[in-house]
């Protein structure tokens, strides 16, 4: 077995020393083969001596198996071997190391630089020209994060805009917000992201309080001023079409009825009742009859000015 290993190991050395001729020699390649000759391989260890024959045999048995899979299986088989089975390969590795030291006394192992790991580290770092001369990469990353947070708060929805709006309202609360009328209005929807104009909120409250009034009651004046001040603060009051509080309803209804009666009594003849529908109809007919009498000519005929 040792003689077979010696022949396998000596043949590559002889082949590497053979093409030393010039460019005119048939086997030599001239100066192109000098870097290959200067590179000296490391001596094989015990595992490499053992796996050399085993690798060739396994590759012949499994031609489609990848070389990495073969190496994994050979490493597992090598660990299963006992010390007595490993002894001849260990001795052969020692002999090859001694021969290598005699042939290359000035040999020094110089491993190649692993450029892949360096590329991975430099992949996520910015070039030096993009940064300011006095700014470190850590400080620049912190500045970028703060800038992103600043722009994220502008849209009003992300990054807890609801909690931000509530904090602002907590520090500057209007005294009118603690009134029972405003608590009844705000109990349904209070969202910090949307914003309505104060005119829209006051108009909605006005439509819910009194639909056909011409004068605003004192209670409504106080309520609308509170709503407008709340809208100017930036909060949202979305009032659905529901019944207003009972106290405000009775007060506004009385004011509305009084105003309507005053307006209707202006057009009724004296002695008429505004609540009587027959008197209303007769007053309308009487006013129409007077209109046509005033428009008639001296002969009692209506002038044909409309033709």
UniProtKB/Swiss-Prot annotation:
* CDD domains associated with the record: HMG-box_SoxB (cd01388)
Principal place of residence:
nucleus
Q: Annotated motif 9aaTAD: location in the chain?
A: 259-270
Q: Which residues bind DNA?
A: 40-108
Q: Where in the cell is it found?
A: Nucleus; Cytoplasm
Methyltransferase as a keyword of this entry, yes or no, is no
The set of disulfide-linked cysteines is none
Regions of compositional bias (Gly residues) in chain numbering: 21-30
Keywords of this entry? Cytoplasm, Developmental protein, DNA-binding, Gastrulation, Nucleus, Repressor, Transcription, Transcription regulation
GO MF: beta-catenin binding; sequence-specific DNA binding
User: Membrane-spanning residues where?
Assistant: none
Q: Region labeled Disordered — which residues?
A: 1-41
Q: Which GO terms describe its biological process?
A: formation of primary germ layer; negative regulation of DNA-templated transcription; negative regulation of transcription by RNA polymerase II
Q: What is written about domains in the entry's comments?
A: The 9aaTAD motif is a transactivation domain present in a large number of yeast and animal transcription factors.
Function text = Transcription factor with sequence-specific DNA binding activity. Binds to the consensus sequence 5'-[AT][AT]CAA[AT]G-3', showing a preference for 5'-AACAAT-3' and 5'-AACAAAG-3'. Inhibits beta-catenin-mediated dorsal axis specification by binding to sites within the promoter of the beta-catenin-regulated gene nodal5. Maternally derived sox3 acts as a transcriptional repressor of nodal5 and nodal6 to restrict their expression to the vegetal hemisphere of early embryos and thus establish germ layer formation.
Q: What is this protein called?
A: Transcription factor Sox-3
What is the protein's species of origin? Xenopus tropicalis
